[in-house]
UniProtKB/Swiss-Prot annotation:
HAMAP family: Ala_racemase (MF_01201). It catalyses: L-alanine = D-alanine. This is Alanine racemase. Keywords: Isomerase, Pyridoxal phosphate. Catalyzes the interconversion of L-alanine and D-alanine. May also act on other amino acids. It is an enzyme of class 5 (isomerase). The gene is alr. Its EC number is 5.1.1.1. GO terms for biological process: D-alanine biosynthetic process. InterPro entries: Ala_racemase (IPR000821), Ala_racemase/Decarboxylase_C (IPR009006), Ala_racemase_C (IPR011079), Ala_racemase_N (IPR001608), PLP-binding_barrel (IPR029066). Substrate binds at residues 127, 295. GO terms for cellular component: cytosol.
């Protein structure tokens, strides 16, 4: 019997979700988002993505260094470079570099070695990206440098997870208008891959869907959860009417109740703000959270379930209990939960 919190990473689910990407965008190459340690899944545990993507995208140089140790696949550096030192590191790592700000152009243009770049333009999100005017100035300037090869022009949707949001079409129109002359283009994230075929172009950039999470408010059952987090029942007891559970006595029993204390808490990455009633899965039965989440422990009502000390409890990552559900109960998003697992939790690879 293990008394540890364990995160299991399903290799078959990774393969399945990548296949969903390919089925939805059969004519596009795949740039898989593996930033933030593969959305919290650990880059050393996502071999199906690494082996079967055309490119792998990270945010920072430090992430590119770790990724380069385990693969020779092309790496796209989303944050690009600002200083010459960063440029040299990116070249050494054989990264393709995103240019998203006019201050980067001088650094890029001073290269002494061949480099491949992607140019990012702002079509309405106003986070990163060159304006249309800056973009045309950039391609004119860099076209005179034989060491610089522009691989692709990209942009990013602000509201792709809201299928009918008017910004989706306005951004797509702006992108097409600005890049009509460009051979290779990229705009589609997970939500656009699943809902907007006109945005697929030459490269799609799946992120959250690779890990089995729907980019939309409605859960997508075609995607399979990759991360499953589980912990053991550490204690079972019966409390009486009027007894309270947990810090602050925020939950009070209205009748005799059997409760299980489970060995996971916010110190492991379980959400501190999970509400009373947040479900966990015990022996294929959903049981409600009662009382506040502690650093190391949570309590649930198991009055209607047969369970024993040592039984495994799934906190999220089953078809019956998706991470999207836990995020809603906790007033957060699945991205934050996935990337918030603490270092004391053990990760294992499963079939």
């Amino acid at each position: 019997m293990s008394m540890c919190t364990i995160v299991s990473i399903s290799q078959s689910a990774l393969k399945h979700n990548l296949l969903v990407v390919k089925e939805n965008s059969p004519n596009s190459k795949i740039v898989s988002m593996v930033k933030a340690n593969a959305y919290g899944h650990k880059i050393n545990l996502i071999n199906p993505i690494i082996n079967h993507s055309d490119l792998l995208a990270v945010s920072e140089i430090s992430e590119a260094k770790k990724l380069r140790k385990i693969t020779k696949k092309p790496i796209l550096l989303l944050s690009g470079v600002i200083e010459d030192q960063e440029l040299q590191q990116a070249i050494k790592l054989n990264c393709q570099i995103v240019v998203h700000d006019k201050t980067q152009i001088t650094t890029i243009n001073n290269t002494k070695q061949p480099i491949n770049i992607w140019i990012k333009i702002n079509t309405g999100m106003h986070r990163l990206g060159l304006s249309t005017h800056e973009y045309f100035d950039c391609i004119k300037l860099l076209a005179n440098n034989p060491l610089i090869n522009t691989q692709c022009v990209m942009s990013h949707f602000a509201c792709a997870d809201e299928i009918n949001h008017p910004m989706n079409q306005s951004q797509l129109f702006e992108f097409k208008k600005s890049t009509y002359h460009t051979t290779k283009r990229s705009m589609a994230n997970s939500a656009a891959i699943l809902s907007n075929p006109a945005s697929h172009f030459d490269y799609v950039r799946p992120g959250i869907m690779l890990y089995g999470v729907s980019p939309f408010e409605i859960i997508n059952n075609h995607l399979k959860p990759v991360m499953q987090i589980s912990a053991p029942i550490m204690s079972i007891k019966t409390i009486q009417t009027g007894d309270s559970v947990g810090y602050g006595a925020t939950w009070i029993a209205k009748k005799s109740t059997t409760i299980a204390t489970i060995g996971i808490g916010y110190g492991d990455g379980y959400p501190r703000h999970a509400k009373n009633g947040t479900p966990v899965l015990i022996n294929n039965n959903l049981c409600p959270l009662i009382g506040r989440v502690s650093m190391d422990l949570i309590c649930v009502d198991i009055s209607n379930v047969k369970a024993s000390v040592g039984d495994n409890v799934i906190l999220w990552g089953a078809q019956k209990l998706r991470i999207e559900t836990i995020a809603k109960y906790s007033d957060t998003i699945a991205y934050e939960l996935l990337t918030g697992i603490s270092s004391r939790v053990a990760f294992v690879s499963t079939i």
